[in-house]
């Protein structure tokens, strides 16, 4: 969280679309597991100026290397609706909707503030801390890219953790 400005997700169908596009354009054949960040970068790049740089981090790579068609056939055989259409209609566990056009690929923002609060909540839960000092407060503020006053407010008001020394 310390270095994140934004956290986005994409739909499965969009990843399959990018995987196939990469195979068609570059002749690169690999499974979609490594192309999740590529799909997000593709969507974000469409909104950026030519001279801007995008940095993406793949959060999951299985190295499975499965061909995407095998995965889509497996999904179909297990009752998943696999079709072309609007990826926004995709429902996890029910459907994989592959875009009909590259413009349909979108990055969907997750609420970073919610993730940051969850991070603090997990720290409190796992450590069972009831009080933190100023240096710990400063560390947490840097860790989640918030001011010390914001972190103090969250810790005291939402998690009943006392912040001592100022």
Q: How would you label these PLM feature ranges?
A:
Residues 26-37, 50-53:
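Flexible, glycine/charged-enriched surface loops at secondary-structure junctions
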Residues 10, 31-33, 57-59:
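Generic beta-strand/beta-sheet core signal
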Residues 12-17, 22, 36-47:
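A short, acidic, amphipathic alpha-helical segment used as a generic capping/interface helix at domain edges
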Residues 39-93:
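Catalytic phosphate/nucleotide-handling subdomain of diverse soluble enzymes
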Residues 1-28, 71-153, 158:
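Active-site/ligand-binding loops adjacent to catalytic centers
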Residues 164-165:
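Long, compositionally biased intrinsically disordered regions
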């Amino acid at each position: 969280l310390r270095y994140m400005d934004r956290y986005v997700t994409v739909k499965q169908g969009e990843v399959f679309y990018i995987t196939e596009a990469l195979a068609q354009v570059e002749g690169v054949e690999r499974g979609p597991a490594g192309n999740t960040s590529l799909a997000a970068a593709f969507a974000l790049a469409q909104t950026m100026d030519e001279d801007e740089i995008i940095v993406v981090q793949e959060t999951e790579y299985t190295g499975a290397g499965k061909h995407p068609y095998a995965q889509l056939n497996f999904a179909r055989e297990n009752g998943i609706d696999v079709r072309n259409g609007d990826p926004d209609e995709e429902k996890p566990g029910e459907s994989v909707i592959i875009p009909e056009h590259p413009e349909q690929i979108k990055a969907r923002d997750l609420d970073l503030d919610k993730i940051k609060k969850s991070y603090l909540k997990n720290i409190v839960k796992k450590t069972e801390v009831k009080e933190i000092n100023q240096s710990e407060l400063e560390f947490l503020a840097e860790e989640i890219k918030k001011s010390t006053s914001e972190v103090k407010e969250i810790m005291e008001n939402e998690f009943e953790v006392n912040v001592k020394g100022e």
